[in-house]
Swiss-Prot record:
Name of the protein in question: Putative nickel-responsive regulator
InterPro entries cross-referenced by the UniProt entry: Acetolactate_synth/TF_NikR_C, ACT-like_dom_sf, Arc_rbn_hlx_hlx, CopG, CopG/NikR_regulator, Ni_resp_reg_NikR, Ribbon_hlx_hlx, TF_NikR_Ni-bd_C
Family of this protein: Belongs to the transcriptional regulatory CopG/NikR family.
Organism this protein belongs to: Helicobacter pylori (strain HPAG1)
Record-linked Gene3D superfamilies: ACT-like. Chain A, domain 2 (3.30.70.1150), Met repressor-like (1.10.1220.10)
Intrachain disulfide bonds: none
Length: 148
């Protein structure tokens, strides 16, 4: 009986590319510090899978996970409370928040979210649109099985 997980086995396959695409791939390997073309291609495939999963518009799919990074002026009146109110009113699950003081005026907050893609992206737009918010970036993820 094979005790190895199918998702753990490595399958070798070949890809045909034009020279200019191969050159670009090799440049990215060097620029980003990858040890091989395979490592870069695996990361690119994972990125595309996440992107495609988030593009699927299923309001009942609560499997999306994201991290919202927000930098804001903590002297902006009532901004903290408005950010909290938006989180509570949203259709997403706020799993965790982390708050740090960057300097005298700026705070950085990370908010880990779970829910459907529409609600998570709406929360990002609402918080990002508040007066005093200087930066609001959403990093998208989802949990998927390789061996389905």
């Amino acid at each position: 009986m094979d005790t190895h997980n199918k998702g753990d086995s490595i399958i070798r396959f070949s890809v045909s590319l034009q020279q200019n695409l191969l050159d670009e791939l090799d440049n990215r390997i060097i620029k980003n510090g990858y040890s091989s073309r395979s490592e870069l291609v695996r990361d690119m495939i994972r990125e595309k899978l996440v992107e495609d999963n988030w593009a699927e518009d299923n309001p009942n799919d609560e499997s999306k996970i994201a991290v919202l990074v927000v930098i804001y002026d903590h002297h902006q009146r009532e901004l903290n409370q408005r950010m909290i109110d938006i989180q509570h009113a949203s259709g997403t699950h706020v799993l965790c928040t982390t708050h740090i003081h960057m300097d005298e005026h700026n705070c950085l907050e990370t908010i880990i979210l779970q829910g459907n893609s529409f609600e998570i992206q709406r929360l990002q737009l609402e918080i990002g649109g508040l007066r005093g918010v200087k930066f609001a970036k959403l990093t998208k993820a989802f949990s998927f099985e390789y061996d389905e």
